């Protein structure tokens, strides 16, 4: 049988579709190639439950005789974070004692399958989606696909790793505090955190039900949008569902995206934080230089309303919402929880109803302050994460180091914003030199397509600059840097 190993070097959706149209590849051949890789060792601890060859083949067989052009995701392999339901496959949220086997898929998964996508497995995560490191799982600390000494980021850890390794063209994660963005940044991927409610969270094990979003990992903005378009739709029984309402003119297929004149809010210098990481500080400065070269307008903003909102998420009563999601299970089987998760959720009991209402009042005030900032800008640009860390560093100090990853992400869902993690080249100085660096573009609710257009312009208008996104030192799908 002909080898299709080259697939794993660039698993883009359009490249796959082109091969299907040309007859040089079939979905069944793709499944055979993927099964050969996912059935063996898993040194990155990316998977909780890879699908077997036969399980994947059922989805491939269902595509036989179908029109490729009628199915936007025809034969496209995707991975699913194991807190999202896939019919007939256990959902565990990385807690084996919590496992159940759904009879129907989550609506977002069902829509993707209906569009022709092929699920290939359930991925590892920080237990109950609580964490940004990927290290809080009984299935092993998820390791970075590009350098296994480093953390993958989380909580959608395996979702990012599966795409970075080229096994999946895209994957689904969830994002409450940055879980769909931090792992993307650590792997040079795009991570779309959509507007709350636009992708249904039915069939998703809740973390903070009022804040949870299903997120998308992809190799390109085009791929992320194709998945976003296919997955979107209101589930009638989803109380948190919202119709997608993009601003007028946001989705003009013939328009050429440009950064020229776009007003990017940038936190004041004294509000930027890298926790001593010179690699990330230098990389962000280089990203801002490239935005200026593309004629974007950089507007200094007071970032304090956003930082204060971020502090509410883990220093306020929203931790109690995590407990509410699994209280009955946690009370009955406390020893089934990962020790760090047990510590975090155990602290939720100290928050009273009065504390919660005081926090809601505080959040309303911060939203008002943030709205004033938005009057001057079109989007915010920040590092996606303030720093990165090795697996050993996280094992030594799991809560404090993890919290650093959320400095620029924790505010987004509380303020009802959309966000997109975008690759921004690699670190060129300091101890993280050679590892990917990412920025995040943040916009108002329902401006998801605006963000994707900004990302397209970012790629088109900044790739000629030294150290830019796809220069000779940048990690591409299926590659890794030898940093040893």
Regions flagged by a language model, labelled:
Residues 2-176, 289, 294:
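Gly/Ser-rich catalytic/binding loops embedded in alpha/beta enzyme cores
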Residues 24-32, 61, 65, 276-301, ...:
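Acyltransferase
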Residues 81, 112, 291, 326, ...:
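Conserved hydrophobic/aromatic pocket- or pore-lining residues that grip, position, or stack substrates
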Residues 105-231, 413-426, 433-440:
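Short glycine/serine-rich loop segments
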Residues 193-282, 305, 461-484:
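A short helix-breaking turn/cap at a secondary-structure junction
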């Amino acid at each position: 049988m002909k080898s299709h190993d080259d697939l794993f070097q660039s698993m883009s959706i359009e490249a796959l579709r082109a091969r299907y149209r040309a007859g040089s590849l079939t979905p069944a051949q793709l499944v055979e190639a993927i099964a050969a890789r996912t059935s063996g060792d898993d040194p990155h601890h990316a998977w909780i439950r890879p699908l077997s060859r036969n399980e994947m083949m059922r989805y491939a067989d269902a595509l036989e005789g179908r029109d490729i052009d009628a199915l936007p995701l025809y034969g496209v392999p995707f991975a699913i974070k194991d807190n999202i339901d896939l019919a007939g496959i256990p959902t565990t949220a990385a807690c084996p004692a919590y496992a159940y086997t759904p009879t129907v898929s989550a609506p977002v998964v069902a829509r993707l399958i209906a569009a022709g996508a092929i699920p290939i497995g359930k991925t590892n995560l920080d237990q109950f989606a609580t964490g940004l490191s990927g290290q809080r799982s009984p299935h092993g600390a998820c390791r970075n696909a590009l350098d296994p000494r480093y953390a993958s980021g989380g909580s959608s850890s395996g979702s990012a790793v599966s795409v970075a390794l080229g096994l999946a063209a895209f994957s689904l994660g969830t994002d409450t505090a940055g879980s769909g963005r931090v792992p993307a940044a650590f792997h040079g991927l795009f991570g779309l955190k959509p507007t709350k409610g636009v992708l249904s969270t039915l069939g998703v094990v809740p973390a903070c039900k009022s804040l949870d979003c299903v997120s998308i990992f992809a190799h390109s903005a085009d791929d992320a949008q194709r998945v976003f378009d296919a997955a979107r739709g209101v589930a009638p029984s989803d109380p948190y569902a919202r119709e997608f309402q993009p601003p007028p003119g946001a989705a003009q297929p013939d328009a050429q995206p440009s950064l020229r004149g776009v007003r990017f809010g940038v936190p004041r210098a004294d509000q930027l934080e890298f926790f001593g990481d010179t690699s990330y500080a230098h990389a962000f400065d280089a990203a801002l230089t490239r935005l200026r070269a593309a004629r974007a307008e950089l507007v200094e903003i007071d970032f304090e309303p956003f930082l204060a909102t971020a502090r509410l998420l883990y220093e306020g009563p929203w931790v109690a919402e995590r407990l509410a999601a699994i209280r009955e299970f946690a009370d009955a089987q406390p020893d089934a929880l990962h020790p760090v998760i047990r510590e975090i959720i155990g602290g939720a009991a100290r928050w009273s109803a009065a504390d919660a209402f005081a926090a809601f009042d505080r959040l309303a005030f911060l939203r008002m302050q943030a709205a004033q900032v938005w009057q001057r800008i079109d989007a915010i640009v920040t590092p996606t994460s303030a720093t990165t860390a090795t697996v050993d560093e996280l094992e030594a100090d799991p809560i404090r180091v993890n919290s650093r990853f959320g400095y620029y992400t924790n505010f987004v869902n509380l303020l009802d914003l959309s966000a997109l993690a975008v690759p921004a080249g690699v670190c060129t100085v300091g101890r993280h030199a050679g590892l990917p660096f990412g920025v995040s573009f943040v916009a108002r609710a329902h401006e998801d397509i605006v963000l994707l257009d900004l990302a397209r312009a970012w790629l088109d208008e900044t790739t000629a600059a030294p150290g830019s996104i796809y220069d000779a030192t940048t990690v591409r799908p299926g590659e890794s840097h030898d940093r040893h």
